[in-house]
């Protein structure tokens, strides 16, 4: 088993971001957002999930899926951060 290079990891992330901008199911989209939020803010997946759950980020994604899943992923991550901050989050 070998570790992925940084370039391979970036390519995988880029592919996932492109897929997110296409039609994904709600569960897939929420999972992708949790993963990308974790990566962007250097959190583990469980910590990212708990943070987004506690400060209504996941609720926001659930309520606004129809609009959010067609926006660029970076915009959704920015909005998630803002929603969480409005609800007491400190990232």
Q: What are these model-predicted stretches?
A:
Residues 29, 47, 76-79:
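Residue-level detector of well-ordered alpha-helical segments, enriched
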């Amino acid at each position: 088993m070998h570790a992925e290079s940084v370039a391979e990891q970036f390519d995988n992330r880029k592919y996932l971001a492109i897929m997110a901008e296409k039609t994904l199911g709600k569960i897939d989209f929420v999972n992708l957002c949790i993963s990308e939020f974790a990566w962007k803010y250097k959190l583990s997946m469980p910590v990212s999930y708990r943070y987004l759950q506690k400060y209504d980020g996941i609720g926001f994604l659930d309520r606004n899926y129809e609009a959010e899943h067609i926006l660029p992923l970076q915009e959704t991550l920015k909005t998630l951060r803002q929603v969480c901050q409005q609800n007491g989050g400190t990232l």
